[in-house]
Swiss-Prot record:
Catalytic activity line of the entry: 7-aminomethyl-7-carbaguanine + guanosine(34) in tRNA = 7-aminomethyl-7-carbaguanosine(34) in tRNA + guanine
Protein keywords: Glycosyltransferase, Metal-binding, Queuosine biosynthesis, Transferase, tRNA processing, Zinc
Family: Belongs to the queuine tRNA-ribosyltransferase family.
Pathway membership: tRNA modification; tRNA-queuosine biosynthesis
InterPro entries with a match to the protein in the record: ArchSynthase1/Queuine_TRR, TGT, TGT-like_sf, tRNA_ribo_trans-like
Coiled coil regions in record: none
Protein name: Queuine tRNA-ribosyltransferase
Protein purpose: Catalyzes the base-exchange of a guanine (G) residue with the queuine precursor 7-aminomethyl-7-deazaguanine (PreQ1) at position 34 (anticodon wobble position) in tRNAs with GU(N) anticodons (tRNA-Asp, -Asn, -His and -Tyr). Catalysis occurs through a double-displacement mechanism. The nucleophile active site attacks the C1' of nucleotide 34 to detach the guanine base from the RNA, forming a covalent enzyme-RNA intermediate. The proton acceptor active site deprotonates the incoming PreQ1, allowing a nucleophilic attack on the C1' of the ribose to form the product.
């Protein structure tokens, strides 16, 4: 019996987008869903109660960072990640692969795994497919990721082909190392860059291993948005319709909607929390940089169409003052707003699928947000 189960509720007649639920050992969440990122077992400045109140059905934590600090054995001793951070709903952990390839300047990729330097202190470390699974088994997340190679964009077809083949072999090794399949669902990660033939090969390899869910990796790494959309259009039909599909590292409003239209169920990204710390806010009419001087005497909320805690209680002028003074409360307010904005957007997307009007919703949202303008400002 798999630890997780995908339930398809409805398909949008306009686009083919999926409305569903994912059942896990720690509860069920609606899809499509955006997952806030809690890198070190916390979503920066947010409490679990606040995240639940705004509709976060699942959050993500980073295996690499938790392995380094505080260590997976301490978290196992605490009773697992859920008890350690007092979060009783689903948790997804990544494999650590992305961090190994993005944070470490010194790395050596071998068949057995990756030798690299700790980005904090320079110590030599080694991460293999088996080790990545062992760490996640200790963390006790509901959904785990296979260890994959994350090639840069762009990369040659020759390099990408070898990388895809290695990732497929690593996925099989990780599956064999997984000792808690009844408690934790392990996803395979489809790679292949912008090459459709390699995406097809990667998907075929992973589907043959019968994972309970599939991730699409190697996108949102610098490629143009039309390339990402083309890759998704080619890749999602190759994945089983009765299992969840997760697009990794995507969190801008337009990419979330376009990903859903192309059959994706789950998304994560640090974008809403990272830009919030610099005072950049997502609003129903586009990007708003709260530090700008024009908001000095602006006593309206960040977004007059938003009913989040921040917008119901505080003005642009006040939040601008806090952010400019580097007050933590200002970061809390912008973080709360951005997460609420994306989670509410996904709620609206689910409603549009239920009403078979997702294409219409996209058109309306893009027009209001300003994505259709020649000078459109994205994130």
């Amino acid at each position: 019996m798999s630890a997780i189960r995908y339930e398809l509720i409805k398909t949008d007649k306009q686009t083919g987008a999926r409305l569903g639920k994912i059942h896990t050992p720690h509860g069920t969440f609606d899809t499509p869903m955006f997952m806030p990122v809690g890198t070190l077992a916390t979503v920066k400045t947010m409490s679990p109660e606040e995240l639940k109140a705004m509709g976060a059905g699942i959050i993500l934590s980073n295996t690499y960072h938790l392995w380094l600090r505080p260590g997976e054995e301490l978290i196992r001793e605490a009773g697992g990640l859920h008890k350690f951070m007092n979060w009783d709903q689903p948790i997804l952990t990544d494999s650590g692969g992305f961090q190994v390839f993005s944070l470490s300047k010194m790395r050596d990729i071998k068949e057995e795994g990756v030798h690299f330097r700790n980005h904090l202190n320079g110590d030599k470390l080694f991460l293999s497919p088996e080790k990545a699974i062992q760490i996640q088994n200790a963390l006790g997340s509901d959904i785990m990721m296979s260890f994959d190679e994350c090639p840069p964009y762009p990369a040659s077809h020759e390099y990408m082909k070898k990388s895809v083949e290695r990732t497929s072999r690593w996925a099989e090794r990780g599956l064999k190392a997984h000792v808690r399949p009844e408690d934790q669902g392990l996803f395979g990660i489809v790679q292949g860059g912008a090459y459709e033939d390699l995406r097809a090969q990667s998907a075929k390899d992973l589907v043959s291993l019968d994972f309970p869910g599939y991730s699409i990796g190697g996108l949102s790494v610098g490629e143009p948005k039309d390339v990402m959309n083309r890759v998704l259009e080619h890749t999602t039909p190759l994945l089983p319709a009765n299992k969840p599909r997760y697009l990794m590292g995507v969190g801008s409003p337009d990419s979330l909607i376009d990903g859903v239209i192309r059959g994706v169920d789950m998304f994560d990204c640090v974008l809403p929390t990272r830009i919030a710390r610099n005072g950049t806010c997502m609003t129903s009419s586009g990007r708003l940089v709260i530090k700008n001087a024009k908001f000095t005497h602006d006593f309206r909320p960040i977004d007059e169409n938003c009913d989040c805690y921040t917008c119901k209680n505080y003005s642009r002028a006040y939040i601008r003052h806090l952010i400019r003074c580097e007050e933590t409360f200002g970061i809390r307010l912008t973080t709360y707003h951005n997460l609420h904005f994306l989670l509410n957007l996904m709620k609206q997307v689910r409603g549009a699928i239920m009403e078979d009007r997702l294409a219409d919703f996209r058109e309306e949202f893009f027009e209001q947000y300003g994505f259709n303008r020649p000078d459109a400002k994205n994130f």
